[in-house]
Amino acid sequence: MKIYKVLNNNAALIKEDDQEKIVMGPGIAFQKKKNDLIPMNKVEKIFVVRDENEKFKQILQTLPEEHIEIAEDIISYAEGELAAPLSDHIHIALSDHLSFAIERIQNGLLVQNKLLHEIKALYKKEYEIGLWAIGHVKETLGVSLPEDEAGYIALHIHTAKMDAESMYSALKHTTMIKEMIEKIKQYFNRKVDENSISYQRLVTHLRYAVSRLESNEALHRMDEEMLYFIQKKYSFAYQCALELAEFLKNEYQLHLPESEAGYITLHVQRLQDLSE
């Protein structure tokens, strides 16, 4: 495997069958130059240079190498924890994001993640990986990233797991759920325990409902007698669910069926009982 261009100590550009490829591995390009050989057993990753990987090629030449190495450590750890490969795009997105986050912290700038509680509830496994990641940054560079960054990293990992859904879609769903939670808080005029099981169940159910509504998939139907019972027994919580339905209709053009409002009522009521 012959080097076409050295990108940094751990990455190089090669040409095979008239195709440019990025190869990566610890120290594979250290003190090497064009036309030097790279042993195949030292190569850990190979990317074909397409449009999106063109940016990765630039990132490899401009970002601090230690930031890229940490991003790759996080990706490898995530793939091990999830027992699944992540999309190539995360190598660009996470390296770029992580380097910028480290730079911000070193300059004393904090960016609050307003979706943190929702991310923790929706993407638990990815969030745990995010916590490992900020610990790894601390251990490697001595830079303390806030918990907010664990949330951002979790979103990047979640997006990289998906084939059909983009980062935009994941952010949109998370934002929609946050807006619905805020409406519930306003309706009951009190704080909720965002670490409670009831809160996590509500968020998980809202994610399920929103995802199915957007993809026009059928939602579980509730027995009419049960729905009537819920409407009467938990009338205040049911009115809250109807307000959420109106919100989804006006803001996102999504129609929430009456039976689904019944299921949401049960989750809202549990949260209300816990807050009293």
Curated annotation (Swiss-Prot):
Activity regulation behaviour: Activity may be regulated by phosphorylation.
Organism phylogeny: Bacteria, Bacillati, Bacillota, Bacilli, Bacillales
GO BP of this protein: positive regulation of DNA-templated transcription
Keywords per UniProt: Activator, Phosphoprotein, Repeat, RNA-binding, Transcription, Transcription regulation
UniProt name for this protein: SacPA operon antiterminator
SMART domains, A to Z: CAT_RBD
Deletion phenotype: Deletion mutant exhibits a 10-fold decrease in the synthesis of sucrase SacA.
Gene it is expressed from: sacT
Family: Belongs to the transcriptional antiterminator BglG family.
Keyword field contains NAD: no
Residue ranges of domain PRD in the record: 62-167, 168-276
Classification via Gene3D superfamilies: CAT RNA-binding domain (2.30.24.10), PRD domain (1.10.1790.10)
Protein purpose: Mediates positive regulation of the sacPA operon by functioning as an antiterminator factor of transcription.
